[in-house]
Amino acid sequence: MELKKIAVGLTALLGMSVANAHNVWLEPASSQDEYVVKFGHEQTETYPESKLKSIQALNSQGKLTAVDYQFRNGEAYLMPKSDLVFVHFDNGVWSKLPSGKYVEKTKREEPTAEFSTNPVKFGKAILKWDAESFKSHQQAYELIPQEKAQANKPLSILVLHNGKPVQGIKVGVSEDAPFNLTNEKGIAQFTPTKGFNKVWAEFEEKVTNNADYDRRTVEYMLTFDAQ
C-alpha cells in the first residue's frame, strides 16, 4: 500500500513538473553558428513541433521577423542572422484529476478535474550584446538587462508586461532557486556567473469564461553570456 501511495505521488509530481516547471531557451548546437531550442527543467526533453508557436529574430531594421528552422529529432535547429532571438512555446493544457494525477487534457475532456492549466513559455536569447539588448521590443512579456552583463556583478533586470513595468515578479536562476522580487519600477537584481546564464521569471494570467482551462501560467527565460 505504501509503495502504491509513493508511486501515485511521484506520478502527480511528474505531471505537475511537466505542466509548470519547464522552460524554453536557445543554446549553441554542435554545428558552428547553429542553435537549438531546448525545452525542459533539470533535464531537457523533446517536444512536438506543434507546441513551438514562433521563433523570431530582430532584423537590421529593428523589426521582428520569423526565423526559418529545421525540426530534427524532437527539437528545432536554426542559424539566426541576428543578435536577438525570441521563442514562444505553448505546452498545451494540463488537468489535475481528483487522484492527484496530471494529464494533458482540457477541462472539457476531463470535467472532473480539480483545475486545468495552460502553461505558456517564452524565451529571449541575447546572442551578442549591442544597443538592442537594452530596448523593449513590443512583447507581451519581456526581461531587459539594464547594462551589459558582467560575471559576479549584480545586474538590474527590467520586467515588462505589455510594455509596462511589473512589481512583485520573481526573478532568479530557476523556480527551484532563490529569487528577488521586482520593485515598484519593475526592476530586480540578478548576479550573473561567468559563461552562459539563464534568468527565469514567472507570471500568472487571469482566465475567465474559458471552457478549456481555469488558469494560465507564463514562464520566461532570458539567456546571455557574461565574462
From Swiss-Prot:
Residues 1-21 form the signal peptide. Keywords: Signal. It comes from the Bacteria. It holds the Pfam family DUF4198. InterPro entries: DUF4198 (IPR019613). This is Uncharacterized protein HI_1624. It comes from Haemophilus influenzae (strain ATCC 51907 / DSM 11121 / KW20 / Rd).
